Amino acid sequence: MRTASISRRTAETDVSVSIDLDGTGKATIATGVGFLDHMLELFARHGLFDVTIKVEGDLHVDQHHTTEDAGIALGQAVAQALGDKRGIARYADIHLPMDETLSRIAIDISGRPFLVFRTSFRVEKIGQFDTELVREFFQAFAMNAGITLHVETLYGENAHHIAESIFKGLARSLRKAVAIDPREDGRVPSTKGSL
């Protein structure tokens, strides 16, 4: 089974994450940040990952540490669940529409963490959620999952739709990239023999 559980405690947050990469999309999310919960529920559902995330953070300060640390722990859980990455598809991409918005997400489960983030928001907040935290989440996730991640919104107006399109796009492309490719016959998908 490709599962993992991560616990991470700092002076700012206490985070626990579990993931099953071969799940059915069940989500139990409680970060204390409503919009982030919504995005993480979308991530689980569209990735068909079973995900549990609980965060107790310093929300009296702001939502930054909670959002970033959720991304760190989720990324670590994905990396751990992938193990040596034998048999995975490795690469995936998707164009994901959400009403007037279209975003493109591309992933390489390379072991070389990198983020290209070409998405912007016309407003500073979605409800009470700072839109700049969307990038912080993706940065934390990519660095800790050990993936190369390209996120680009080609066009869009509504900030909620833009955020939703890239979270769903991450889920759908990650779902394809972590899928077991029977033609790999259990090999690591790299000429180097390791990722």
Swiss-Prot record:
The protein's annotated pathway: Amino-acid biosynthesis; L-histidine biosynthesis; L-histidine from 5-phospho-alpha-D-ribose 1-diphosphate: step 6/9
Cellular location(s): Cytoplasm
Gene3D superfamilies on file: Imidazole glycerol phosphate dehydratase, domain 1
Matching Pfam families: IGPD
EC number(s) reported in the record: 4.2.1.19
Cysteine-cysteine disulfides: none
Catalysed reactions listed for this entry: D-erythro-1-(imidazol-4-yl)glycerol 3-phosphate = 3-(imidazol-4-yl)-2-oxopropyl phosphate + H2O
GO molecular-function term, one example from the UniProt record: imidazoleglycerol-phosphate dehydratase activity
GO CC, any one term: cytoplasm
PROSITE patterns: IGP_DEHYDRATASE_1, IGP_DEHYDRATASE_2
UniProt keyword annotation of Amino-acid biosynthesis present: yes
Subcellular location, principal: cytoplasm
UniProt similarity note: Belongs to the imidazoleglycerol-phosphate dehydratase family.
Stated name of the protein: Imidazoleglycerol-phosphate dehydratase
Natural source organism: Methylorubrum extorquens (strain PA1) (Methylobacterium extorquens)
